[in-house]
Amino acid sequence: VKIGLVSLGCAKNLVDSEMVLALFIESGFEVVVDPEHADVIVVNTCGFIDSSKKESIESIIEMAKYKKKLVVIGCLVERYLDELKKAMPEVDLFIPLRQYPKMKELINGLFPKETINIELSPFRRYLSTPWYSAYLRISEGCNNRCSYCAIPIIRGGFVSRPIEDLKKEAALLAAKGIKEVVVISQDTTRYGTDLEVKTNVTELLKMLLSFKEFAYIRLLYLYPDELEDSLIELIAKEPRLTPYFDLPIQHASTHVLKAMRRRGDKEFLRSLILKIRDKVPHAVIRTTLIVGFPGETEADFRELLDFVEDMKFDHLG
């Protein structure tokens, strides 16, 4: 039986796709690059912004033309399950995020006899990244309630993975020859604060550094006001920690930041960026911005423009 998978959205969604591929491959399925030649097509959707939703819907419609077994999973399904069921009867199975623990049983319901014989697990992944690199997802969900963002609605509240589980997964990646680990989360700097035995992302990095196989370790998605000095100092002194700060500020106007329900203000952001530049002179700082936010004035936009020019970010998104 041949499986084809279309994975849309962010790196965190890609990790889910890798777990789904392993579910099929370790049950004897063959992966094909062209879904047209597959017996089962899985579309892992994104439901974050309008363009992502449109891309997901177009992909489902395109895959339905082949009319094999069509399974649709992911954030769009979690957010719009009832609407999708009504609008797309050609889909054989929708699996929202909340039903991922039952994925084995749900998929087996499509076949006359049990076909999938293992459970979905972060310790079983069919890596789709380049041979030397892999993502390590350290948590799920988000507790920030930014006014423009649906992630907490889709993925739920922030839940850290136990550091013992992450150490086990890191060992599996090291055994596969992975040289670069990219640490991902909805809110990486919050890691460990919700665990029974409190820890933090700095301690997590120290654990990853204990694996000599990893030549590079990179962090993504750092919420500005949770970025501790200890983390900056560790990145400054450890050559295997990539001096890359993925620091989404979204805006610089205090008025707009309040409307966005973002913590911190322009002066806090300025002092943080200058601190990073001072402690890590070779740092690369990337940020993301939202312009045209409801209520943003021309003065707000000019304030943001001046701030960006002043801070000299290395990359903007």
Task: Report residues per predicted region.
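Contiguous mid-protein beta-loop-alpha structural module that forms a pocket-lining wall or clamp
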Residues: 296, 310-313
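Conserved strand-turn element in the central/C-terminal portion of the radical SAM core barrel
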Residues: 8, 145, 149-156, 217-225, ...
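Proteins enriched for Cys/Gly/acidic motifs involved in redox and nucleic-acid/cofactor modification
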Residues: 1-191, 230, 241, 245, ...
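Conserved glycine-rich "GG(E/T)P / GGGxP" loop and the immediately following alpha-helix
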Residues: 47-52, 178-207, 211, 223-230, ...
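Short acidic/polar active-site loop segments enriched in Thr and Asp
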Residues: 179, 215, 314
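Radical SAM/AdoMet-radical enzyme domain recognition
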Residues: 175, 202-203, 207-216, 228-287
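A cross-family glycoside hydrolase active-site/sugar-binding cleft signature
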Residues: 73, 137, 184, 218-222, ...
